[in-house]
Amino acid sequence: MFAGLPSLTHEQQQKAVERIQELMSQGMSSGQAIALVAEELRANHSGERIVARFEDEDE
């Protein structure tokens, strides 16, 4: 479970995807790009935050 994740609008999510794609087109790995954008979002986000729970369902 992750607490304090930014709650993003669809437009904000789309901009994040575009930023990740831009970084990857410049040679950054997908993992690095995602981590960087996530860090930027957390640092700059001033809106609501959510609690998210991720579970692996390999069964």
Curated annotation (Swiss-Prot):
Domain of life: Bacteria
Pfam family for this entry, one: UPF0181
UniProt family annotation: Belongs to the UPF0181 family.
Name of the molecule in the record: UPF0181 protein YoaH
Source organism (scientific name): Escherichia coli O127:H6 (strain E2348/69 / EPEC)
Encoding gene (name): yoaH
